[in-house]
Amino acid sequence: MKELNEQTFDQAIAASPLAVVDFFATWCGPCKMLAPILDGIEGETPDVAFYRVDVDQAPDLARRFGIMSIPTLIFFRDGNEFVKTVGVLRKPDLLAKLTELKTR
């Protein structure tokens, strides 16, 4: 999963019709639980771009998107925020959100 920062974020999201951004921190236990789930789903859904943003390294992005708790996932469609989730989601719940992102 590619890590984004303030300089790369907007271009990456604009270039990705469907994208999921994981706002995380290296010290966050729940973030560490979510990472392998996202890595697995990334391999199963080549039509969705997956990115990560370290909130400690990119605090302006965290503020811009109102990140108050981590992990937070933001799903984007055509460059626009579609839905935001907070906390660890199970794989079936993530797949359901991706289906919603693709079809709604």
Task: List the predicted regions and their residue ranges.
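A short beta-strand-turn-helix
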Residues: 2-19, 59
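CheY-like receiver
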Residues: 11-12, 61-64, 97
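Short pre-active-site segment immediately N-terminal to redox-active cysteine/selenocysteine motifs
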Residues: 17, 24-27, 69
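Conserved redox-active cysteine motifs that mediate thiol-disulfide chemistry
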Residues: 23-36
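Structural micro-motif
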Residues: 59, 65-74
